[in-house]
């Protein structure tokens, strides 16, 4: 089972189908429009576990969470929802002993009405699971996570995900608060990208005070805000006006030029960030150029998606970008994700692993 943004089930299904085929696991995705999830039905027993282990979760773009389904309950009795789940799981020999329990719903308005029930249900369910030996007596982040996902009252999928190959967040969504002094809500996209793409223990080194960043298409400054907040200096490139609150920090230089034409005058930039409303292929190529020329070491940027053929567009743009970097002998690590705060767009992170001689 995979969670995704409502309206992106088709893209999520295309992706799981591709990844399963690569692992020689065969089946088909069950897709219900705007449901916020996809269930991939495997033809062979044990294949769901193979996918939960074998698919690199961080390589999935459209999935917010992934777990192997062990059982589906379509009509749990309202007076006792615990016993049928315990009875079923106790019969499954291969079900792993779990270290954490998450009782969740897909991210739709209808399903989220069940969240209050999910919260109330968690403590008695956890106690019952521990009593049956299905969970360890103490929370253990190194053990599998037990997921119960309610898609409707009395209708749930029960399964497990593996630590290090799942989303650490409840429902696959980081809980971020909008900072009152940020100039636009887009600031949360970049903050979420830092949480998703950069391990927390590396923040001090890779998002360090005193670094220089460049923000293309910066105004009014939602993304710049995240860099300034981390005591960085920023070249803001946009013909529009920047928020006064950012200008007053003394940490930014505003360049009123086209983002596609700006060139940094010194090679001291660590971060290039970009959230321009432009054709995705054009933005991807621009970011490739920045990294190739040694103008930045890391990039986070958004690719706006077309109305149709979104998955194909993403695959094509990423393939072209990877090919461009490989042909130019740039060593890199690339991640892409349809973040919670993204809408008709995805966010890409590229870290340069090789020092490139200036061209």
UniProtKB/Swiss-Prot annotation:
Keyword S-adenosyl-L-methionine attached: yes
Keyword NAD (UniProt): no
Molecular functions per Gene Ontology: S-adenosylmethionine-dependent methyltransferase activity
Entry keywords, A to Z: Cytoplasm, Methyltransferase, rRNA processing, S-adenosyl-L-methionine, Transferase
Location in the cell: Cytoplasm
Primary localization: cytoplasm
Positions bound to S-adenosyl-L-methionine: 186, 219-222, 238, 258, 275
Active site: 304
Cellular component terms per the entry's GO annotation: cytoplasm
Biological process (GO), any one: rRNA processing
Described purpose of this protein according to its UniProt entry: Catalyzes the 2'-O-methylation at nucleotide C2498 in 23S rRNA.
Subunit description: Monomer.
Recorded family membership: Belongs to the class I-like SAM-binding methyltransferase superfamily. RNA methyltransferase RlmE family. RlmM subfamily.
Name this protein carries in UniProt: Ribosomal RNA large subunit methyltransferase M
Source species: Vibrio campbellii (strain ATCC BAA-1116)
Record lineage: Bacteria, Pseudomonadati, Pseudomonadota, Gammaproteobacteria, Vibrionales
